[in-house]
């Protein structure tokens, strides 16, 4: 079995259904004997360019290990799911289990926001 990194972009109006999509893809992998090494929900982010007149979308990254048939099933699911705007599948040499650079950035942003909300308001 080979290792892959998959990033897919979901329509921002369908953000609530992202966990269900991830569960469906997990079930497909589990049924075929594949392994999931890392799943990261990067959340709603600004896109580099407009797709279907949208400036923001919901990003998800998955690092998996599966055979070619299972990968084709996943790719078929991405292509025929109208909520998935784009997807990218990259073959990797080894399993990635550490947080990605994007996830570290998301965690920094969340920490900064929580620090700002926890700070007492200064009277002007």
Swiss-Prot record:
InterPro entries: Ribosomal_bS6, Ribosomal_bS6_sf, Ribosomal_S6_plastid/chlpt, Transl_elong_EF1B/ribsomal_bS6. GO terms for molecular function: small ribosomal subunit rRNA binding; structural constituent of ribosome. Residues 105-115 have a biased composition (Basic and acidic residues). Belongs to the bacterial ribosomal protein bS6 family. Binds together with bS18 to 16S ribosomal RNA. NCBIfam families: S6. This is Small ribosomal subunit protein bS6. The lineage of its organism: Bacteria, Pseudomonadati, Pseudomonadota, Betaproteobacteria, Burkholderiales. The gene is rpsF.
């Amino acid at each position: 079995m080979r290792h892959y990194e998959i990033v897919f972009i979901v329509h921002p109006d369908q953000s609530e259904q992202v966990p269900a999509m991830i569960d469906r893809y997990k079930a497909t992998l589990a049924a075929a004997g594949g392994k999931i090494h890392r799943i990261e929900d990067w959340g709603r982010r600004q896109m580099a360019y407009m797709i279907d007149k949208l400036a923001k979308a919901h990003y998800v990254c998955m690092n998996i290990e599966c055979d070619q048939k299972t990968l084709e099933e996943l790719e078929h699911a991405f292509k025929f799911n109208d909520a998935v705007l784009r997807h990218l599948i990259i073959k990797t040499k080894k399993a990635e289990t550490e947080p990605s650079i994007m996830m570290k950035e998301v965690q920094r942003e969340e920490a900064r926001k929580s620090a700002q909300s926890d700070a007492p308001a200064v009277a002007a």
